[in-house]
Amino acid sequence: MTKVLPEASRWKQVGRISLWRYTEHDRNFPGWYLNADAAGCRSLLLLIESLSVDGEGHRTVEIAEPTEAQLRVPNNRGGLAPWTAPSKLRIALVRESGVWTFPPGIDPAILTVGTAWVEPLREGVSGIQLGRGDYSIGTGKTGLPLWFWW
């Protein structure tokens, strides 16, 4: 009998994906900031879809530091505000619908979402490659919000 591997275990990352948060001035710029090139967006969308098919699970994504151009888009102090970025992001999907946890830790950064957050996450990542962003998802009660930037 052949064991069927979860969809997410077959996922392979491609493209450039950046994630960061600001270490100062966070009252006006709270949470995590996500940007990716077109290949990175497609890769993240495939991961989200794979986790959805599996119903639960997790994968770790390699993170690139944001470029100067990426940092200028949110315009926190003209792109010069201090920031920190993880080298890895663990994305986990759990069956409990409303779960959202995204603590500030960076070793690795860990985003855990319930099924209700799958579609908003998918829409946000899709929007990056279309030049849409400057909005966030997530709750401040159990984790930092996630901002999408092009």
Predicted feature locations:
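Positively charged, low-complexity terminal tracts
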Residues: 1-150
